[in-house]
Amino acid sequence: MKTKCVRHSDAQGMVEYALILLLIAIASLLILQLSGISVRDVYCRVASGFGANACGGTAYCKDDFSNLNGWKVSAGPATGWKIVNGQMCADSYGTLANKCSMAGMPSNDYVAEIDGAKLNQGNGYGLFFRATDSGLGMNGYAFQYDPGLSGVVIRKWVNGAEINPALAFKSMPGTDWYGAAHKLSVKVQGNTFIGMLDGVPVLTATDSTYPSGGTALRTWDSTQVCMDSFGVNPIAP
């Protein structure tokens, strides 16, 4: 009589391999969540790399800078902002409010962004968010690309004045701040704000002073900067 031998080693190896893959997947998800990146964000970036528009949605506000009709100078010289070759360019200090977002949006939570921003001179530029114009200046917050501080920073503003200390600051020594185009964006959700540079989270701040508000562009000192486009989008689920 022949005896049959059942081999368990191959099956056990497959189970162990599957468990390892599961642990790697769980760890990756936790890292993404801690970094403020959703799985959908990753999928959208990969799909976009292959030319797909799988994550298209309706922007709350957007501007390709074909003209200045959607903007209002809130501070600084009226001639400080110009459309040059399809880009929004600033050659001075000032604040330029986005009329669409200031008029109100479907949600107080959003992602505001400027794309293709190239700083040629000066101490930096930034994005106001959850902002309103008090008549004395902006109330709200600003996320700033700030070579003057050699870093990026999120500040609270009251009646046109920035409040110290900053809500969040990240030093970036050794960064070449000039001549390269960047995407500056901020994810605004509840009382938590995540500042991103080229799609990568770089700092997080929390504050509950301003629960709602629109967006604006900001420059200071002798800044010269041009940017390709602007948008305020819903947060991906």
Feature roles, as predicted:
Residues M1-D10:
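N-terminal leader/signal peptides at the extreme start of proteins
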Residues L197-A216:
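Short, solvent-exposed beta-strand-to-loop segments that form ligand-recognition rims
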Residues A54-G76, D228:
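Extracellular carbohydrate-recognition regions
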Residues F65, A112-I114, Y178-Q189, F193-G195:
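Short tryptophan-centered beta-strand motifs in secreted/extracellular beta-sheet-rich domains
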Residues G160-K183:
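Short, aromatic/His-centered strand-loop micro-motif at the edge of beta-sheets
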Residues D10-Q33:
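N-terminal single-pass transmembrane signal-anchor helix
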Residues T79-N98, G213, R218:
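Short carbohydrate-recognition loop motifs
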Residues S92-A161, A236:
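Secretory/extracellular carbohydrate-interaction modules
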